[in-house]
């Protein structure tokens, strides 16, 4: 998957650089996003709750010290914040869908401030079914935003 992913990513980067292939680039992006979501959905099907919270490398440096539930939360919080706060300027899915309560998350951030046992304590509180509902809604809303973007939008800056 890594080689295929890398090739698709190169194709995406090439296509979005030109106005006449920009929409094809978005199609490649959607394919990559679907591949990622299918992998995450296979985790939901194949793993048990303990697997989502397991931290076998808690004392390692970098991303190896995290767990699956945290990684899913972290990635989709970043996407939600960027898509809605920075690009569209509207309410994040976390808030509009009342997901903080539904997921039972004590934080609204990406979780960067959490380390070691804090990550483990955090993810043990999460409702995994609702986390998966959240990521599906974030994916859907982000893709609606992406579909609306034009090549000329790439030249726009982020408003203050």
Give the role of each language-model region.
Residues 74:
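Histidine-centered divalent metal-coordination motifs
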